[in-house]
Swiss-Prot record:
It is found in: Cytoplasm; Cytoplasmic vesicle, COPII-coated vesicle membrane; Endoplasmic reticulum membrane; Golgi apparatus membrane. This is Protein transport protein SEC24. CDD domains: Sec24-like (cd01479). Residues 1-46 are annotated as: Disordered. Pfam families: Gelsolin, Sec23_BS, Sec23_helical, Sec23_trunk, zf-Sec23_Sec24. PANTHER family: SEC24-RELATED PROTEIN, SECRETORY 24AB, ISOFORM A. GO terms for biological process: COPII-coated vesicle cargo loading; intracellular protein transport. Its main location: cytoplasm.
Length: 919
């Protein structure tokens, strides 16, 4: 996408009631020099639509014929025009919003005045929300009253409906008073890709928070990529770590220096602390250093190299123990051969900079098969297999030789992996003693800690933690279904806690065409900082299945993980961390323990206001103490400063709808597992009603003019996100969803980083047959592939001759309309006739024409996690769907259209109507 002009919000911010989808804004945008979409196409594009319909009547067409925003509900506002790429509404291009600060050019001087007028005086020190300039530059002279916060812009949800483009806006700006940070650094406040608050203006009292009915929580994603090199942050190597004596907060950009710089006042608890003697000394150059250049005083996100006192024991090596299912199911679907080959091909990618990384292998059927792998250069290079059949008390036959150093045994590990498939290729064994294998693996790696990676195609049916086939199609869609989402065997929770205490993390890779009890197995990752990766109906004979797993597993093995990690959040006096959500073990009231700290998950922390806050700002500081893959103990510190307010309107105007939706996603999963599906769905609807009622009563004067439904512009997508959550695979009422699919969806709803979670709840849909001329091509400024504008998830948006991409981040659908013209099919699929088009899982052919290349570029770009500022190993499958093709596949794709009515659920129009009645 194009970079924002000047990097700061255009005049049409979240304000200007006309700003949402109004024709004036759209035409003004076009006049700004962007080609109007739909009409700007070359001859090819005209042909796609022109043979059957009038040109430019598709979803990306210009305004002609569409109702303006003031139309009745269901008449959507026009989708954003191509102009939106040059100068997006409210803030900045979302793809740029998380870019490193140097990516922004300094804004031209004109325009600052407009910005001041629009947002009030902004002393914002976050480069991702404001231009990089000294905070004082855009600030009005200090008045007795604090800096004005974000303005509240009321909208009517019925006459100005939600537009999907709003989900790409950055959160409401964090407006801090001038001079808040010790140095005027543009990176002093935490960027939203690491930490987002549900409220960017914090109520000073518990009673005001309670009155608002809004949650106060942080969405924390300490890492924005799988590898440090992809998202570098300042590292402070001198081991001079200055912390508050009382509250143990780390020195940060929001402290104040006293006594000629010899002491500093903590911005959390106000205690005065001494500045360490070495704080202003450059140990490398052996000379005094300039304090104003220290990263910990200029950057909200830093990493300290930790000295000895931060270690319970010396840093342990990275250990991967693979527990591989070798039963009949795993051999016949190709899992054994594919995983062995994939591990072999990824050995160079496994982090091993300190050459201490160790690997071990246990094969599992109704017995446990250990493998002793000799060092390279030994007389006998063949691996030895030792079989243990006692599943109740599995012992380690030769503990010393079962975990081997990758650097010392590299060749023999490869030899072993080459032979593994042959060893079991004729098996008829249907047993799977995975619970006993986990116990044995625990005994093997508990002394050092590490990761147990489970690859299984079977239900564990013998030994410890054995499970039975309990799925009953008759209870799906009934109140009894929720019991299937609970753990069937207490072993999985109690064993997970044991693992956590011994610094052992478990990741599950599950592949099955049969019931596998994901609900029970997913407890192991849930309490050990791991993840559950689910591949339903997987078979290596399908090339797409084999390639997807190979790419994901290779990325998984190459990810840099933190070991022996703990996470703690500290805050200004008066605030307390109340509840923590995510995959970890809560070791004490405020300490989360992670045997391994993953790079592809986010966490939610609910904040309570225990005492009245008297300061103009509050600070919340997240610290992750961990050992890197290279054996270095480090502390990653993320400091977020937020303004406080006594005014309910400020709280609502600064609320972040995506962070709020993320919080309620975690709450909903918790509710499903404790009370059931129906209570979780009802709680979401009740919350939507409560928020709308509160806003109407407290801020809209209690009256409803003309039967509307008032809500602030910055929260307009929230009711839609709640509906989309209720209709998500994990929560929706349906008798068609297999229990394993539902359980896997609940794992995603409680772990995905915010951008991926929002996309999983409300997928992206792009119209491809009439996409703008620049879509699918690299942007001139950034070199990034330009995506077409997203469109609302409604069948009203789909024309019968169209081609659409629907992408929820886990699965992609390429929807081919029943009247798609032959030229489109020829250009995209290389097929002259629609009847030859194969539906289902596939990859698009690489054809030598411009349109095919652009469509493939859009599909690939839509999969690109790094551009969203998150780490993820997932490579979505692409399913080709014909509108009049295979009914099951078509219905599955249509469940993504969350604004439509489908499978026992209401449409968006009905949902808004029911909210209106209840409010």
């Amino acid at each position: 996408m194009a970079s924002p002009q000047g990097g700061y919000p255009p005049q049409e911010g979240y304000g200007q009631p006309a700003g949402y989808g109004s024709p004036t804004q759209q035409h003004a945008g076009m006049a700004a020099g962007a080609p109007p979409q739909g009409h700007a196409g070359g001859k090819k594009k005209r042909a796609y639509a022109g043979e059957a319909f009038e040109i430019g009547s598709g979803a990306n067409a210009a305004l002609g014929g569409q109702l303006p925003a003031g139309g009745s509900y269901g008449a959507y506002p026009p989708q954003p025009q191509a102009a939106g790429y040059q100068q997006p509404v409210y803030g900045a291009d979302p793809s740029q919003m998380n870019a490193a600060a140097p990516g922004y050019a300094a804004p031209a001087t004109p325009g600052v005045a407009q910005m001041t007028q629009q947002f009030g005086a902004m002393g914002v020190t976050d480069p991702h929300l404001m231009p990089p300039q000294p905070p004082q530059a855009a600030v009005a002279p200090q008045a007795p009253r604090p800096v004005p916060l974000n303005q509240l812009y009321p909208t009517d949800l019925l006459t100005q409906p939600f537009n999907v483009a709003e989900l790409d806006y950055p959160p409401p700006p964090i407006v801090l008073p001038p001079g808040t940070s010790v140095y005027p650094s543009p990176t002093a406040n935490c960027p939203p890709k690491y930490v987002r608050s549900t409220l960017n203006a914090v109520p000073t009292t518990h009673s005001l928070l309670k009155k608002s009915k809004l949650p106060f929580a942080l969405v924390i994603q300490p890492y924005a990529s799988l590898r440090d090199a992809e998202d570098p942050i300042p590292v402070i190597p001198d081991q001079v770590i200055s912390r508050c004596r009382r509250c143990r907060s780390y020195i940060n950009p929001f402290v104040t220096f006293l006594d000629h710089g010899h002491r500093w006042r903590c911005n959390m608890c106000n205690l005065t602390n001494d500045v360490p003697q070495a704080f202003d000394w450059d140990a490398a150059l052996q000379k005094p250093a300039d304090r104003s250049l220290r990263p910990d005083l200029n950057h909200a996100v830093v990493e300290f190299v930790a000295p000895q006192e931060y270690m319970v024991r010396p840093p342990q090596p990275l250990v991967y123990l693979f527990l591989i299912d070798v039963s009949y199911a795993s051999v016949t679907n190709g899992l054994l051969a594919t995983s062995a080959r994939c591990i072999k091909e990824s050995l160079d990618r496994i982090p091993n900079a300190d050459r201490r990384t160790r690997l071990g292998f246990i094969a599992v059927d109704s017995s446990l098969h250990y493998f002793s792998i000799p060092r390279d250069g030994s007389e006998n290079s063949d691996p030895r297999m030792l079989v243990i059949s006692d599943l109740d008390e599995p012992f380690l036959p030769i503990p010393g030789d079962l975990l081997v150093t990758l650097s010392e045994c590299r060749e023999n590990i490869e030899t072993f992996l080459d032979k593994l498939q042959e060893m079991f290729q004729n098996t008829q064994n249907n047993g799977c003693a995975m619970g006993s294998a986990l116990r044995a693996g625990y005994k093997l790696i508990a002394p050092v800690g590490g990761k147990m990676t489970v690859l299984s195609s079977s239900l564990p049916n013998v030994g410890h933690g054995s499970l039975t086939m309990r799925e009953d199609k008759k209870v799906l869609g009934t109140s009894k279904e929720s019991s299937l989402l609970q753990t069937a065997n207490s072993f999985y929770k109690s064993f997970a806690v044991e693992c956590s205490k011994a610094q052992v993390s478990v990741d599950m890779f599950l592949f099955s065409s049969q019931y596998q009890d994901v609900a029970s197995l997913s407890n192991l990752p849930r309490y050990t900082g791991g993840q559950t990766y689910f591949y339903p109906g997987w078979n290596a004979a399908r090339g797409e299945d084999a390639i997807k797993f190979a790419r994901e597993f290779s990325d998984y093995l190459s990810s840099e993980i933190g070991l022996e990690a703990v996470l703690r959040v500290r805050a200004t006096t008066g605030l307390r961390m109340n509840t923590f959500y995510g995959n970890f073990f809560n070791r004490s009231s405020d300490l989360c323990a992670f045997p391994a700290f993953p790079r592809d998950q986010a966490y939610v922390v609910e904040v309570a206001i225990d005492e009245t806050v008297t300061k103009p700002i509050v600070c919340l500081q997240t610290a992750v103490l961990h050992t890197t893959c290279n054996g270095e103990r480090r502390i990653r510190v993320l400091t977020l400063a937020l303004p406080t307010t006594q005014n309910l309107a400020d709280v609502y105007a600064s609320a972040d709808q995506q962070a709020i939706a993320t919080y309620f996603s975690h709450k909903a999963v918790e509710r499903v597992l404790s009370s059931g599906l129906e209570p979780a769905r009802e709680a979401l609807q009740a919350k939507a009603v409560e928020l709308l009622s509160t806003y109407r009563k407290e801020l809209a004067g209690g009256s409803v003019s003309g039967g509307g439904l008032q809500f602030p512009a910055n929260l307009r997508g929230l009711p839609v996100l709640f509906l989309a959550m209720i209709k998500n695979l994990g929560l929706r009422k349906s008798a068609q969803i297999p229990t394993d699919m539902r359980s896997a969806a609940l794992c995603l709803l409680s772990t995905l980083p915010l951008p991926l979670l929002i996309q999983y709840i409300y997928p992206k849909m792009y119209s491809l047959h009439d996409m703008p001329d620049n879509a699918g091509l690299p942007d001139e400024q950034t070199g990034e592939i330009v995506l077409p504008p997203p469109i609302n998830l409604s069948s009203e948006r789909i024309v019968p001759y169209g081609l659409y991409l629907i992408d929820d981040g886990q699965t992609q659908f390429l929807w081919v309309g029943r009247d798609a013209v032959p030229q489109l099919l020829l250009d995209v699929f290389g097929l002259p006739d629609r009847s030859q088009l194969r539906v289902g899982k596939q990859n698009l052919p690489e054809l030598d024409n411009d349109f095919n290349q652009r469509v493939r570029a859009v599909i690939e770009k839509s999969r690109d996690h790094r551009s969203k500022g998150v780490g993820s190993i997932v490579v979505p499958h692409l399913y080709v769907v014909k509108e009049d093709g295979e009914p099951g596949l078509r219905l599955w794709a249509q469940t993504m259209l969350v604004e439509d009515r489908a499978d026992q659920s209401v449409s968006l129009v009905q949902w808004m109507g029911s909210l209106r009645e209840k409010v």
